[in-house]
Amino acid sequence: MTVKEYAGELGISKRLLTDIKFGGGDLQINGEHVTVKYVLKEGDLLIVKFPEEQVSETLLAEPVPLDILYEDEHVLVINKQPYVSSIPSREHPSGSIANGIIDHYQTTGVRATVHLVTRLDRDTSGIMLVAKHRFAHSILSSAQKNGLVKRRYAAVVHGRMAQMEGTVDAPIGRHPDSIIERTVTPDGQKAVTHFYVTCANDDMTSVALQLETGRTHQIRVHMSYLGHPLCGDTLYGGTRQEIGRQALHSEHLSFIHPLTQENMRFHAPLPQDMSKLIKGENH
């Protein structure tokens, strides 16, 4: 087995190996530099030296409040509030979670940049997973692609859903008339969403959703596809009579810790606006 093959088993991506080669890192066997083509022998000690984390020059530190659920030297788990972007955009160039993370790192003396493993739309609330260095990011990104980063969402949709539980297996791609909107299309990427109803009345349904894939706007598109757009989601057919944003919350997250191999589980309670909506206090 070569160093390259073994590194892959450790979760070191090809991209990260390239960064190690050209970014100031090193691969050593028994204290001597080797290339990725080196064939490992019994008793070899492999040392991987990762390049020093480069702090982004374009991402500014801003004192954005962060609700930190967990933090160690490898990962950061955050409960994002609604109306806060994950990263800066042209429409919202500042005040993002990423800006707040940079500020948090500077305040706590951590030399790192932002490695988001999971992102949320600006109006979606709930749990986000962040890696604090490239190795953790590489492992967690691979785990996510293999369905090992589990996310469960809570949503409120318009109308009473007839089916108490089910699976939407419908490919998602860009809408031909929009750079933002997505749609179910035969030539889109595979997208699978599992759902089950938690409570309902004639006007709306509270539903729990588990993602098998992670396409942009996946839950919003799939619920609209079923004829039950999210309350507040005007992009996909919802109205804002009851709530001022799409009623979507990342409620549960579980993953295997990239370094300790511990089973990590987190829960974020519903924000006040969604809790009131479910209780019928918003209308």
From Swiss-Prot:
The record's catalysed reaction(s) read:
a uridine in RNA = a pseudouridine in RNA
- Which species is this record about? Bacillus subtilis (strain 168)
Tell me the lineage of the source organism: Bacteria, Bacillati, Bacillota, Bacilli, Bacillales
Key word Heme present in the record?
no
Q: What is its EC number?
A: 5.4.99.-
What are the alphabetically sorted keywords of the record? Isomerase
GO biological-process terms attached to the record: enzyme-directed rRNA pseudouridine synthesis
Reply yes or no: does the keyword Isomerase apply. Answer: yes
Top-level taxon of origin: Bacteria
Q: Pfam families per the record?
A: PseudoU_synth_2
Similarity-based family: Belongs to the pseudouridine synthase RluA family.
What is the protein's given name?
A: Uncharacterized RNA pseudouridine synthase YjbO
Picking any one GO molecular function of the record gives: pseudouridine synthase activity
UniProt-annotated catalytic positions:
D121
